[in-house]
Swiss-Prot record:
Entry keyword annotation includes Transmembrane helix: yes
Residues covalently joined to lipid (S-palmitoyl cysteine): C524, C1397
Bilayer disposition of the protein: Multi-pass membrane protein
Biological-process GO terms, alphabetical: bicarbonate transport; cellular response to cAMP; cellular response to forskolin; chloride transmembrane transport; intracellular pH elevation; membrane hyperpolarization; multicellular organismal-level water homeostasis; response to endoplasmic reticulum stress
Name of the protein in its database record: Cystic fibrosis transmembrane conductance regulator
Binding-site residues, ATP 1: W401, G458, S459, T460, G461, A462, G463, K464, T465, Q493
SUPFAM superfamilies: ABC transporter transmembrane region, P-loop containing nucleoside triphosphate hydrolases
Lineage of source species: Eukaryota, Metazoa, Chordata, Craniata, Vertebrata
Length: 1482
């Protein structure tokens, strides 16, 4: 960044904002980059501002029982705030004084007033000077107030972030991420621009008092008639505002529903295309859009009336003020013009400035109170440790997650001791405690010596992570004692990657030691990965390490924990995303050898780890089920250990399967498990299979696929239970992860639409607490096409050389946390870490965009012509009035009456030509109430245009090829449907209306002035030319600065969420100061852009006003010097010229707003112009209930005989198939050729990333493909894409359940009757599940069907395939996380319902693969082998490597017995448990 010219700028340059000229010039000539932005002044740095406010807040906390944040803010900013307020007031006073001078100038043209005529020129100079003074006072004052507002926001941003890092886990459990984002964006945005309006809460009343005093002098009591009308108008506007909010609240729920479905569609677009559901999804979304648009129109109409009321009020205010006085006493002409000028100022003060100021104070004080409450939340307490302690001891420890339970426990215990109450009372006390919440850990005891390994095992929700949290001090024990040295290192269950390089992630602020670093890299198997990157370990990782695989992230997290020199290492399931061989090697080399002399606590469920541990602690429902050695486990719990050992390949199971088996075993053998379960508990568990509610609702804030929902989900049907998920959670079900009331769930939890342009946004579905965010994994299943070849680790299954035994920790490092962070952090690096893709849109909206926008709906052009016709009619009326004035005698005393002092005065009477003249002045102010006949059709039509654009964009996205969609971020696509459509619906119609309204007022006023005094037209031409040139000059830079500012917001919120995700790691490593510094750097980056935007905006506003001041000076002196005796002419010219001043500036700002908002239209057009998938029929196939063919999803084909249906057998022939993700990309699959006989089952084999799932996608033509595939003799080139895809039934790896009823999810086209759906539900074992829910098939699933287990969701997919009657079934790891029961159901259904179908299976379970007749082995993008299992096992192959010799002995007899045509019977559950899973995930 460049040094700011502001630092060396002169007073003159600062006053006129001339120091911004270099950046304006550069922005006009070329595209601005981040390096072009100026550094912020030191006074605006987040460090200084936060330190200042933090000092005052600490002082407030120390001095008072009831601290107020507003007092701390007052001590920091009050005097500057008041100084600029006084400047603002003085600027506003000049507006009140201007009409006085105008009246004197008009009076000087009275033929009998010769005295004042001589000083008219001086009065004109005085009037012009008032405009100059107002310009010099107003702009510095407004800029100063914006600047203070910015500083207040920065200081509070920083204070809140520091508080977040200190919050206790119990508090984090009750705060949703949406609430934090809202706190930082919604509330604090009010300070930035709102502060300039705050002073009008006292300025406006003073202004009104002054104006009423001056009007009283002119009109006496009748002046209050106009004021009364304005007050009534303000109240009406307030009422309309409330009505508008009511409509908008109703509409928010509808928008929410639409965006939920849209986001689910975008997340699962591949499944939507595979199922051919494009039309069904489009119809569903369009139906929701229709309901939303009805409310949008109502809100827009109310807003329109509210806005236009201001424009139309001017005539009535003057009319009501003057008429009573004129009827009673008559009135001279100059009083009319003076009154008009006063009323213009009065109208602005009463109907705009004061209501806005009150709203600003209301919002700001509300925001300050919210922040104040947040800053007083309970903080994380650092436990006291004894550094000399070498052992880790836990004695009788009990803990609760619920806030206050522990304190309650202590208090009640003290009461027990004091009062020595009886046993009966004691039991009463404990029963009361149980009502408050169940303990997450109960009576835990263990002791481990230095250098020992403690393995902690237990089923899901047993309290394993909570145990580690308690050792770290994150969870306070309610009773018991914990003892350890306090020097802790921690590896989280869900790997957390901070933005930065691999090296920085591993070192994490600890001083660098080359030998130690290399040892850790080697032990964690990272050498091969790092060597593949061009930048090695200096490669910058994006948000959440998105470019890495799950295994790479896990190993970097482990390396970070191991690198730190600590006494105690807490490893929370660190091997979850590693394949079996890598896990074994890392466990041996790292945990057992490298860390041999360190105390380690490892959370695991692997038998191999339990055998090697010095001590084992098995938890069940928060209690210690067993503590001792492995041999003691076998002796004391023989049933339990033999049961686990009975699973021959327990270690080979995935973590989810091991947890499932462990849960069942613990349930069977625990003492508590034998007790009878109450009826209520049974009912509560009825949705769960083997204790699982299902796949945990992943709060993937940092994942661009799943982090795109901006609105909370509205639950239509009340759930019969609190859906707290268990599957991956480490806390028991009793723990409530979010205590936000249900009534709040309809709120949109995100800031206004202008807060984010790009970058991450936050989902609010069933508000997740921050603690829940920390204990959920980021979705690791990133599509492989999103990773570059360099960043995808090809896992080698070959054993690597064993590390020599070493203990690198003997090399004690120098003081920790010694990383120097005061140095300047590269902003480009920050941008690379945090920011989303920069949009490729021109700096200024092109004319082509405007023309396309006009052409969207023919009615829009007609409405604009209609507006022009009305405008011409208004001008014609105006000219007719002028003609009447010209022909009437100018000072007809016959129509007047003598005033008291004998001088000739112009009196208004009903017959006077001046009455017409007066009417015209009112007409000129409002141009005959412009809008009711013009504005309403315009607003209505613009909303219709928005409707059409949304429809076209949705259609285009659904029809776009996957190669195009893969290049876009899901969050970016949803932004078009949320933010940009909201702009098209809400902001654009009213902004265009305002601009048209203001522009016509200005043109009308200029036309009138020019007709009255032709010389003024000569002054108008250069002014309009200057305005157009200046606007174009400024617009280039301002739009780029706004874009950069918008991008600058992204790092702030991304860093916030990144910090929350890794908060436990941050605290364990003590890196809070480092992350505060990073946050301040991100804030400073945004501030630099925002401050420069504010400065250039003020430069532009001041230049516009200076041009108008010059114009007004020209008009004044032309009028004074060239007009003969005609006070009416001078009056109307000067009155309109003064009115033009404010109106034209408003029109200029509106034109800039229109240009800015039209960028959203440009982005929408960009999506509408996306290419469509090749081969799609122009006439889409509409399913019909009556049509039997569409009902069974089979189509007549020209290549097949009329009597046949296609496909009939399911024979597939693949010839030279090559697949790419994008046209110019590398081939993912090359020259694949093979054939499959009808009804044959083929298994796909290959390591992770070999291309198995890619091949299935290629069959569905979801990729760019070359070559040919034929099904039953019909080539894919000869039929439409939709017909081709409907030949396949699909069970994808990523299950797609959208928000809707069971019926809609199974049959979105509504083709099948209830009986047919129930029949299929019976076949796949879903009936019992669906019948448990109220409404059965009509029960509404939300949040991706989180109330269903992963197994139930797979059964839903299976049911869809059965209903489709497809002849070819594609299965992509259907049993990845299934419990044994659901897996048996799927196997049975595949054998029965798809007995005659061709099945292509990609699977990791060996037993499942044995059902296949042939296997296709894919290596290095090509087919290596295509044979039967016997041949594959007899040769050296990947399949042979994956199966141990003992397994081969078992498998051959079974395989030989199933060679015959009749397939083997379904394996029983007992047999199923003896299977082996070959886990090859990274």
């Amino acid at each position: 960044m460049q040094r700011s010219p502001l630092e060396k700028a002169s007073v003159f340059s600062k006053l006129f904002f001339s120091w911004t000229r270099p950046i304006l010039r550069k922005g006009y000539r070329q595209r601005l980059e981040l390096s072009d932005i100026y550094q912020i002044p030191s006074a605006d740095s987040a460090d200084n501002l936060s330190e200042k406010l933090e000092r005052e807040w600490d002082r407030e906390l120390a001095s008072k029982k009831n601290p107020k944040l507003i007092n701390a803010l007052r001590r920091c900013f009050f005097w500057r705030f008041m100084f600029y307020g006084i400047l603002l007031y003085l600027g506003e006073v000049t507006k009140a004084v201007q009409p006085l001078l105008l009246g004197r100038i008009i009076a000087s043209y009275d033929p009998d007033n010769k005295v004042e005529r001589s000083i008219a020129i001086y009065l004109g100079i005085g009037l012009c000077l008032l405009f100059i003074v107002r310009t010099l006072l107003l702009h510095p004052a407004i800029f100063g107030l914006h600047h203070i507002g910015m500083q207040m926001r920065i200081a509070m941003f920083s204070l809140i972030y520091k508080k977040i890092l200190k919050l206790s886990s119990r508090v984090l459990d009750k705060i949703s991420i949406g609430q934090l984002v809202s706190l930082l964006s919604n509330n604090l945005n009010k300070f930035d621009e709102g502060l300039a309006l705050a002073h009008f809460v006292w300025i406006a009343p003073l202004q009104v008092t002054l104006l009423m005093g001056l009007l009283w002098e002119l009109l006496q009591a009748s002046a209050f008639c106009g004021l009364g009308f304005l007050i009534v108008l303000a109240l009406v506007q307030a009422g309309l505002g409330r009505m508008m909010m009511k409509y908008r609240d109703q509409r928010a729920g509808k928008i929410n529903e639409r965006l939920v479905i849209t986001s689910e569609m975008i997340e699962n677009i591949q499944s939507v295309k595979a199922y051919c559901w494009e039309e069904a999804m489009e119809k569903m979304i369009e139906n929701l859009r229709q309901t939303e648009l009805k409310l949008t129109r109502k809100a827009a109409y109310v807003r329109y009336f509210n806005s236009s009321a201001f424009f139309f009020s001017g005539f009535f205010v003057v009319f009501l003020s003057v008429l009573p006085y004129a009827l009673i006493k008559g009135i001279i002409l100059r009083k009319i013009f003076t009154t008009i000028s006063f009323c213009i100022v009065l109208r602005m003060a009463v109907t705009r400035q004061f209501p806005w100021a009150v709203q600003t104070w209301y919002d700001s004080l509300g925001a300050i109170n919210k922040i104040q409450d947040f800053l007083q939340k309970q903080e994380y307490k650092t436990l006291e440790y004894n550094l000399t302690t070498t052992e880790v001891v836990m004695e009788n420890v009990t803990a609760f997650w619920e806030e206050g339970i522990g304190e309650l426990f202590e208090k009640a215990k003290q009461n027990n001791d004091n009062r020595k109450i009886s046993n009966g009372d004691n039991s009463l006390f404990f029963s009361n405690l149980a009502l408050l919440g169940a303990p997450v850990l109960k009576d835990i005891n263990f002791k481990i010596e230095r250098g020992q390994l403690l393995a902690v095992a237990g089923s899901t929700g047993a309290g394993k992570t909570s145990l580690l949290m308690m050792i770290m001090g994150e969870l306070e024990p309610s009773e018991g004692k914990i003892k350890h040295s306090g020097r802790i290192s921690f590896c989280s269950q869900f790997s957390w990657i901070m933005p930065g390089t691999i090296k920085e992630n591993i070192i994490f602020g600890v001083s660098y030691d080359e030998y130690r670093y290399r040892s850790v890299i080697k032990a964690c198997q990272l050498e091969e990965d790092i060597s593949k990157f061009a930048e090695k370990d200096n490669i910058v990782l994006g948000e959440g390490g998105i470019t890495l695989s799950g295994g790479q992230r896990a190993r970097i997290s482990l390396a970070r924990a191991v690198y730190k020199d600590a006494d105690l290492y807490l490893l929370d399931s660190p091997f979850g995303y590693l394949d079996v061989l890598t896990e074994k090697e890392i466990f041996e080399s790292c945990v057992c050898k490298l860390m041999a002399n360190k105390t380690r606590i490892l959370v695991t469920s692997k038998m191999e780890h339990l055998k090697k541990a010095d001590k084992i602690l098995i938890l069940h429902e928060g209690s210690s089920y067993f503590y001792g050695t492995f041999s003691e486990l076998q002796n004391l719990r023989p049933d339990f250990s033999s049961k686990l050992m009975g699973f021959d390949s327990f270690d080979q199971f995935s973590a989810e399967r091991r947890n499932s088996i462990l849960t069942e075993t613990l349930r069977r053998f625990s003492l508590e498990g034998d007790a009878a379960v109450s009826r209520n508990e049974t009912k509560k568990q009825s949705f769960k299979q083997t204790g699982e509610i299902g796949e945990k609702r992943k709060n993937s804030i940092l994942n661009p696929i799943n982090s795109i929902r901006k609105f909370s989900v509205v639950q239509k049907t009340p759930l019969p239970m609190n859906g707290i998920d268990e599957e991956d959670s480490e806390e028991p079900v009793e723990r409530r992860l979010s205590l936000v009331p249900d009534s709040e769930q309809g709120e949109a939890i995100l800031p206004r639409s202008n807060v984010f342009n790009t970058g991450p946004t936050f989902q609010g579905r069933r508000r997740q607490s921050v603690l829940n965010l920390m204990t959920h994994s980021v979705n690791q299943g990133q599509n492989i096409h999103r990773k570059t070849a360099a960043s995808t680790r090809k896992m080698s299954l070959a054993p690597q050389a064993n590390l020599t035994e070493m203990d690198i920790y003997s090399r004690r490092l120098s003081q920790e946390s010694s990383l120097e962070i005061s140095e300047e952090i590269n902003e480009e690096y920050l941008k690379e870490c945090f920011c989303d893709d920069v949009e490729n849109i021109p700096a200024v909206t092109t004319w082509n965009t405007y023309l396309r926008y006009l052409a969207v709906n023919k009615s829009l052009s007609l409405v604009l012509i209609w507006c022009l016709v009305i405008f011409l009619a208004e001008v014609a009326i105006s000219l007719a009035v002028l003609l009447l004035l010209d022909k009437s005698p100018r000072y007809s005393k016959g129509n007047g009456t003598a005033s008291g002092n004998g001088s000739s005065a112009v009196i208004i009477t009903s017959t006077s030509s001046y009455y017409l003249f007066y009417i015209y002045v009112g007409v000129a102010d409002t141009l005959l109430a412009l809008g009711f006949f013009r504005g309403l059709p315009l607003v209505h039509t613009l909303i219709t245009v928005s409707k059409i654009l949304h429809h076209r964009m949705l259609h285009s996205v659904l029809r776009a090829p996957m190669s195009t969609l893969n290049m876009l971020k899901a969050g970016g696509i949803l932004n078009r449907f949320s933010k940009d459509i909201a702009i098209l619906d809400d902001l654009l119609p009213l902004t265009i209306f305002d601009f048209v309204q203001l522009l016509l007022i200005v043109i009308g006023a200029v036309a009138v002035v020019s007709v009255l005094q032709p010389y003024i037209f000569l002054a108008t031409v250069p002014v309009i030319a200057a305005f157009v040139i200046l606007r174009g000059y400024f617009l280039h830079t301002s739009q780029q600065l706004k874009q950069l500012e918008s991008e600058g917001r992204s790092p702030i919120f991304t860093h916030l969420v990144t910090s929350l995700k890794g908060l436990w790691t941050l605290r364990a490593f003590g890196r809070q100061p480092y992350f505060e510094t990073l946050f301040h750097k991100a804030l400073n980056l945004h501030t630099a852009n925002w401050f420069l935007y504010l400065s250039t905006l003020r430069w532009f506003q001041m230049r516009i006003e200076m041009i108008f001041v010059v114009f007004f000076i020209a008009v004044t002196f032309i009028s004074i010097l060239t007009t003969g005796e005609g006070e009416g002419t001078v009056g109307i010219i000067l009155t309109l010229a003064m009115n033009i001043m404010g109106t034209l500036q408003w029109a200029v700002n509106s034109s800039i707003d229109v240009d800015s908002l039209m960028r959203s239209v440009s982005r929408v057009f960009k999506f509408i112009d996306m290419p469509t998938e090749e081969g799609r029929s122009t006439k889409s196939i509409k399913p019909s209930k009556d049509c039997q063919l569409s009902k069974v999803m089979i189509f007549e084909n020209l290549h097949v005989k009329k009597d046949d249906i296609w496909p009939s057998g399911g024979q597939m022939t693949v010839k030279d198939l090559t697949a790419r993700y994008i046209d110019s990309g590398n081939a993912i699959l090359e020259n694949i050729s093979f054939s499959i006989s009808p009804g044959q089952r083929v298994g796909l084999l290959g390591r992770t990333g070999a291309g198995k799932s890619t091949l299935l996608s290629a069959f569905l033509r979801l990729l760019n493909t070359e070559g040919d595939i034929q099904i039953d003799g019909v080539s894919w080139d000869s039929i439409t894409l939709q017909q081709w895809r409907k030949a396949f039934g699909v069970i994808p790896q990523k299950v797609f359940i959208f928000s809707g009823t069971f019926r809609k999810n199974l049959d979105p086209y509504e083709q099948w009757s209830d009986q047919e759906i129930w029949k299929v539900a019976d076949e796949v074992g879903l009936r019992s599940v669906i019948e448990q829910f109220p409404g059965k098939l009509d029960f509404v699933l939300v949040d991706g069907g989180y109330v269903l287990s992963h197994g139930h969701k797979q059964l839903m997919c299976l049911a869809r395939s059965v209903l489709s009657k497809a002849k070819i079934l594609l299965l992509d790891e259907p049993s990845a996380h299934l419990d044994p029961i659901t897996y048996q159901i799927i196997r049975r259904t595949l054998k029965q319902a798809f007995a005659d179908c061709t099945v292509i299976l990609c699977e990791h379970r060996i037993e499942a693969m044995l059902e296949c007749q042939r296997f296709l082995v894919i290596e290095e993008n090509k087919v290596r082998q295509y044979d039967s299992i016997q041949k594959l096992l007899s040769e050296k192959s990947l399949f042979r490597q994956a199966i141990s010799p003992s397994d081969r002995m078992k498998l051959f007899p079974r395989r030989n017995s199933s060679k015959h045509k009749s397939r083997s019977p379904i394996t029983a559950l007992k047999e199923e448990t003896e299977e082996e899973v070959q886990e090859t995930r990274l």
